């Protein structure tokens, strides 16, 4: 199976003694960074919905973005992203063999880099996939990346001998993948919390994001190849709900708040 997750806005730039690889779409990342650095501070602030301080920080990041960055200026992607999904993934605690397996079976969708392997070297950035950054390919990043993402995922799935993709990414990011061009069965797990208030279980964004990362970790640590094995996921107290699930949308529920 191939698993996809979203990146994160927050970064952990601690040094890591881990070998890194070069992103497949490094040239595109450079091209997009040059486009972004040409924006005024006000335009960048509006484009990404940033405060003044964050707009200045990300303008500086785009200005410093290098075509061939020094090793000390980069970090491995899965260890650098620090959002909710990555709390669930806990990439820093994966052992060497698990990271090697993840390198082939986990992909991170990115507004700047397109598709990243866990150990791909990234420079600090923030550029959400939903950003309406105008490029030579269109008026937003969906139009820029759509064909490339589908081709890259198809090729990687073929290289590891699978026709199944586990979508643990957000709608914002997976929406950049052209569905008709994706030659894979897509399974999208749903994670819900039951407050026992008579209103039924609900998706709570923070918990759902963390659970997606935990599901990716579950696949990695168990080296899953059979989609039916996803039903065994029970991290954090979640339990598979067969009566609410379909083959391509397994549903997992746990009591709220999480213990």
Swiss-Prot record:
One Pfam assignment: H2O2_YaaD
Alphabetical list of InterPro entries matching this protein: YaaA
Signal peptide residues on this chain, from the entry's feature table: none
Top-level taxonomic group: Bacteria
Gene Ontology CC: one annotated term: cytosol
Gene Ontology biological-process annotations: response to hydroperoxide
Listed NCBIfam families: PRK02101.1-3 (NF002542)
Entry's family note: Belongs to the UPF0246 family.
Name of the featured protein: UPF0246 protein RD1_0358
């Amino acid at each position: 199976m191939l698993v996809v997750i979203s990146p994160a806005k927050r970064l952990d730039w601690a040094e890591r003694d881990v070998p890194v690889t070069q992103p497949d779409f490094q040239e595109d990342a450079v091209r997009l960074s040059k486009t972004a650095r040409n924006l005024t501070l006000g335009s960048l602030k509006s484009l990404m919905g940033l405060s003044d301080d964050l707009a200045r920080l990300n303008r500086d990041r785009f200005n410093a973005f290098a075509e061939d960055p020094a090793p000390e200026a980069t970090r491995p992607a899965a260890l650098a992203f620090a959002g909710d999904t990555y709390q669930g993934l806990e990439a820093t605690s994966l052992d060497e063999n698990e990271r090697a397996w993840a390198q082939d079976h986990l992909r991170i969708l990115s507004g700047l880099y397109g598709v990243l392997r866990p150990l791909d070297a990234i420079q600090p950035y923030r550029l959400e996939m939903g950003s309406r950054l105008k490029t030579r390919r269109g008026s937003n990043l969906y139009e820029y990346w759509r064909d490339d993402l589908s081709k890259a995922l198809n090729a990687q799935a073929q290289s590891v001998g699978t026709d199944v993709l586990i979508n643990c990414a957000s709608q914002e990011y997976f929406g950049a993948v052209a569905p008709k061009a994706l030659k894979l069965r897509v399974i999208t797990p749903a994670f819900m919390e039951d407050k026992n208030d008579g209103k039924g279980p609900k998706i709570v964004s923070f918990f759902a994001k963390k659970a997606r990362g935990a599901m990716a970790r579950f696949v990695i640590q168990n080296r899953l190849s059979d989609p039916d094995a996803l039903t065994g996921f029970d991290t954090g107290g979640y339990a598979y709900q067969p009566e609410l699930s379909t083959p391509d949308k397994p549903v997992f529920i746990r009591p709220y708040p999480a213990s």
